[in-house]
């Protein structure tokens, strides 16, 4: 059976030169991952040990008021804590005791480090061990850092999941583990496709509830659904699990190759694969074709933001007819992103890390049709006449798998259509 996909390029970007940037960054910190994780993990609570700035960021980004009692909060470090005039550990213990007595539904508590807690060297790992012993087994306490000193944007989820992996039960069962947080409707689509292929049992990390936590062992194979999970990938590998490498499921091609890699691992016949995927593939291809009319022939520049950039560049160049000038990403994990880089034709600059002033200079020099960047850069670039796309939308919007492929292309087409309308109106 032929997958009826375009042939790979003669030379991809996996083994090409990478421009290493180590300057000023313009990205959100890892605390932002809490915004989608607290919705996914329904018996978890994320307690940020940080400042009022951390609290304002989370409240604003989540779009909820604190009296709504979301599954996150901030233990505020006051001036006396920062000055070493108070026992921050004792105060943290009291806050946790108060929280758990008020919220008996909590089964997983995450102590999340921030810039202030990192600066005063508050040992949240030891605090988590102490509090787990005190409140277990009903509540397990984890810790990870979302500090802007240590992490960028999507690394918060990676650090969170990596903190869970060592505590997962051991198993000898042959299971597929899907790793990465997805909106429930998208996760259901993925599981439905895999189940229709006859693949199972299928487990998910993160689980909705602590009691549903997957096991892991030498017969576990795992597929990542997000490309920013390098630390989690390493933690699972150390537990004996094996990674199924594949392009990420963005667009029709990426989804098909992701599913095919898993299907091959589980011995699914070509005929069965065609039977299950033919209809959703056709829908995805039609939806992408409609949305990509605006994108064909346009040039693209990615600022580093989420680590989705190489996978999205592959989708936009191969399925939407765009050309990439530069593909920037905060970190480049070739073991994870290699299959996508193989399909990204040689040509664009691949940059890792950020030196924002130099990258802005390169945008001005190359004048791309579309620039994908963070919120803080978008308005200044728009004021200079560049068309921009907010990178954060690509994380908070459902964009994975067949049914969202057209929406994904549409996210990039929308700012170009808006710019064209504004130009027509200005000409009139």
From Swiss-Prot:
Molecular function, one GO term: oxidoreductase activity, acting on iron-sulfur proteins as donors
Enzyme Commission numbers on file: 1.3.7.7
TM helices/strands, residue ranges: none
Record's catalysed reaction(s): chlorophyllide a + oxidized 2[4Fe-4S]-[ferredoxin] + 2 ADP + 2 phosphate = protochlorophyllide a + reduced 2[4Fe-4S]-[ferredoxin] + 2 ATP + 2 H2O
Subunit annotation: Protochlorophyllide reductase is composed of three subunits; BchL, BchN and BchB. Forms a heterotetramer of two BchB and two BchN subunits.
UniProt similarity note: Belongs to the BchN/ChlN family.
Name used for this protein in its record: Light-independent protochlorophyllide reductase subunit N
Organism field: Cereibacter sphaeroides (strain ATCC 17025 / ATH 2.4.3) (Rhodobacter sphaeroides)
């Amino acid at each position: 059976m032929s997958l009826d996909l375009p042939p790979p390029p003669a030379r991809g970007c996996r083994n090409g030169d990478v421009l290493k940037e180590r300057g000023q960054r313009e990205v959100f910190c890892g605390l932002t991952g809490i915004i989608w994780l607290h919705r996914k993990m329904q018996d978890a609570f994320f307690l940020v040990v940080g400042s009022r700035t951390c609290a304002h960021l989370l409240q604003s980004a989540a779009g909820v008021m604190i009296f709504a009692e979301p599954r996150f909060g901030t233990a505020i470090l006051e001036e006396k804590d920062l000055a070493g005039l108070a026992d921050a550990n004792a105060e943290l213990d009291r806050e946790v005791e108060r929280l758990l007595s008020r919220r008996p539904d909590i089964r997983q508590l995450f102590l999340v480090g921030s810039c202030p807690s990192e600066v005063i060297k508050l040992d949240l790992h030891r605090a988590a061990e102490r509090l787990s012993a005190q409140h277990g087994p009903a509540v397990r306490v984890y810790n990870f850092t979302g500090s802007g000193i240590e992490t960028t944007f999507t690394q918060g989820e990676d650090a969170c999941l990596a903190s869970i992996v060592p505590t997962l039960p051991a198993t000898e069962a042959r299971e597929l583990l899907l790793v990465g947080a997805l909106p429930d409707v998208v996760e259901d689509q993925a599981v439905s496709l895999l189940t229709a292929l006859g693949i199972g049992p299928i487990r998910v990390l993160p689980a909705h509830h602590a009691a549903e936590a997957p096991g892991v062992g030498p017969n576990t194979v795992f597929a990542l659904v997000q490309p920013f999970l390098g630390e989690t990938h390493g933690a699972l590998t150390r537990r004996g699990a094996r990674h199924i490498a594949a392009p990420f499921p963005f667009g029709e091609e990426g989804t098909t190759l992701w599913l095919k890699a898993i299907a091959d691992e589980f011995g699914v016949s070509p005929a069965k694969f065609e039977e299950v995927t033919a209809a959703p593939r056709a829908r995805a291809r039609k939806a992408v074709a409609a949305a990509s009319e605006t994108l064909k022939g346009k040039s693209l520049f990615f600022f580093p933001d989420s680590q989705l950039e190489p996978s999205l560049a592959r989708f936009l160049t191969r399925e939407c007819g765009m050309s990439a000038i530069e593909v920037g990403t905060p970190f480049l994990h070739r073991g994870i992103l290699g299959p996508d880089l193989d399909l990204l034709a040689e040509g664009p600059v691949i940059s890792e890390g950020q030196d924002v002033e130099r990258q802005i200079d390169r945008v001005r020099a190359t004048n791309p049709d579309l620039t994908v960047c963070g919120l803080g850069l978008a308005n200044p670039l728009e004021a200079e006449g560049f068309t921009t796309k907010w990178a954060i939308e690509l994380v908070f919007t459902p964009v994975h798998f067949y049914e969202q492929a057209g929406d994904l292309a549409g996210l990039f087409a929308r700012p170009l259509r808006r710019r064209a309308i504004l130009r027509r109106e200005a000409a009139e």
